[in-house]
Amino acid sequence: MTSPVDASSSKEKLTLAEKVWRDHVVSKGENGEPDLLYIDLQLLHEVTSPQAFDGLRMAGRKLRRPDLHLATEDHNVPTEGIKTGSLLEINDQISRLQVSTLRDNCKEFGVRLHPMGDVRQGIVHTVGPQLGATQPGMTIVCGDSHTSTHGAFGAMAFGIGTSEVEHVMATQTLPLKPFKTMAIEVTGELQPGVSSKDLILAIIAKIGTGGGQGYVLEYRGEAIRKLSMDARMTICNMSIEAGARAGMIAPDETTFEYVKGREMAPTGADWDEAVAYWKTLPTDEGAEFDKVVEIDGSSLTPFVTWGTNPGQGLPLSESVPDPEDFTNDNDKAAAEKALQYMDLTPGTPLREIKIDTVFLGSCTNARIEDLEIAAEILKGRKIADDIRMMVVPSSTWVKQEAEKLGLDKIFIEAGAEWRTAGCSMCLGMNPDQLKPGERSASTSNRNFEGRQGPGGRTHLVSPAVAAATAVRGKLSSPADL
């Protein structure tokens, strides 16, 4: 954690993002040049790190701060047949090479790694928080788009490219220009049966997939304050789907309670000092954002996507839209293209869309709370005969906690597959893929063409909608059961 700047000496009103930025500036850029920002934590995985390590090696450089790097194996790992974590359990040669290379690099450069078979292994954006490595007020980067997940703790977290990964390895800094700030004010309270996934899908549908471009989004309001940390991570995770650089939620007692006692969290007097600093981070009253967007949380209902980007979504109670109803020519063309790929007819009730595969997994929605929500709906029920349901915990720790609660038995008895931890069907980079033409209801974060496998069609949903859909065989909410 970077030592805080004494804000009491300044009357300037700052947002959460501006405070974290201020406390990490090593040198201020002049004449339009970027600031040099200190990075508190870099997360690594097997896909975007090899070239960065090679860059260090070719330049004869050391890894400046191995202690501020944390690695895990997640993107390419299989989610079945894993017993020991041996490389021989990975059948795909390219995936095996990437995992092997990560292990070799971490050993050579002294980076802490949690490999397959380790109880602390899992998707990188679950591993950081569960270890207590993710803390309020930090700057966190990773060669992965959904690094914004960690913003749920009041950290400024964002994805970077491989050349930037190497830069952080070599210097523990990044040259960056300050981001703009946007407040997402969620008024009212979420109704029973409405989740943080429904909320973030509704936000993206409102502002668009480019609406947050260049901004850090700060999610605010009583509805946000009442969310658990698992739910907050879901919201911040998908900030990138609105085009934002990062998403943040101010730390509070819910945050502190989550972090306290975890392996890498401060202890004793250091904990007290850290909490005192964290309490200074929330946006000052009277601070100005570059943009403010309001959304009525009390009016939301279960939300799903119908198209091929996360902004193409509607309440589950509605029907597939008609491209002719779009007033913007670009939106109209995008809708026409999406409906052709998704093989959907305008006017079809969303609840009548038949599903082949239900995927409960990813860094968006596969933490313990997500699994509990789905298991409660599936308890005593069976999934539809022609449905395949895959349940993939986001970490080995989450898997073990779920098994202690008996959730695995509920899923298996319902007819679902209970897998080991990994990114799995979120992306077509491992054995878990849709076949061409197959349609999924997925708790992941992206519904792009081919994202879950060539020709696969993806509808983004919440864990509750995923579970209800598995039972009914069509897009459904628990109220439909």
Swiss-Prot record:
Pathway: Amino-acid biosynthesis; L-leucine biosynthesis; L-leucine from 3-methyl-2-oxobutanoate: step 2/4. It catalyses: (2R,3S)-3-isopropylmalate = (2S)-2-isopropylmalate. Its cofactor is [4Fe-4S] cluster. Binds 1 [4Fe-4S] cluster per subunit. It is an enzyme of class 4 (lyase). Keywords: 4Fe-4S, Amino-acid biosynthesis, Branched-chain amino acid biosynthesis, Iron, Iron-sulfur, Leucine biosynthesis, Lyase, Metal-binding. Its EC number is 4.2.1.33. It comes from the Bacteria. PANTHER family: 3-ISOPROPYLMALATE DEHYDRATASE, HOMOACONITASE, MITOCHONDRIAL-RELATED. HAMAP family: LeuC_type1. Belongs to the aconitase/IPM isomerase family. LeuC type 1 subfamily. This is 3-isopropylmalate dehydratase large subunit. It comes from Corynebacterium efficiens (strain DSM 44549 / YS-314 / AJ 12310 / JCM 11189 / NBRC 100395).
